[in-house]
Amino acid sequence: MALSLFTVGQLIFLFWTMRITEANPDPAAKAVPAAAAPDTASDAAAAAAATAATAAAAAAATAVTAAKAAALTAANAAAAAAATAAAAARG
């Protein structure tokens, strides 16, 4: 029984302490998130710049690949047309 009353007393003290802490927050604890905010903003800006650079490089690579594919398709179409014309001329 005494242990139970002691435990209840500890819980009451714990919640009472938490209530006081929430009512009077530490000024230094408030300053830490404010100081960390510029770092977060600069990190976000750097990540956005890196993403934009990666997207631009991917777009350039895609354009080069598309140009190569178009040239290959045109060459294959010309070869097929020449083969069709040669076959038609023979027969």
Curated annotation (Swiss-Prot):
GO CC terms in record: extracellular region
Main subcellular location: secreted
Membrane among keywords: no
Keyword terms of this UniProt record: Antifreeze protein, Repeat, Secreted, Signal
Matching InterPro entries: Antifreeze_1
Propeptide: 22-39
Keyword Repeat: yes
First and last residue of the signal peptide: 1-21
Gene Ontology molecular functions: antifreeze activity
Subcellular location: Secreted
Family: Belongs to the type-I AFP family.
Function: Contributes to protect fish blood from freezing at subzero sea water temperatures. Lowers the blood freezing point. Binds to nascent ice crystals and prevents further growth.
Protein name (Swiss-Prot/TrEMBL): Ice-structuring protein
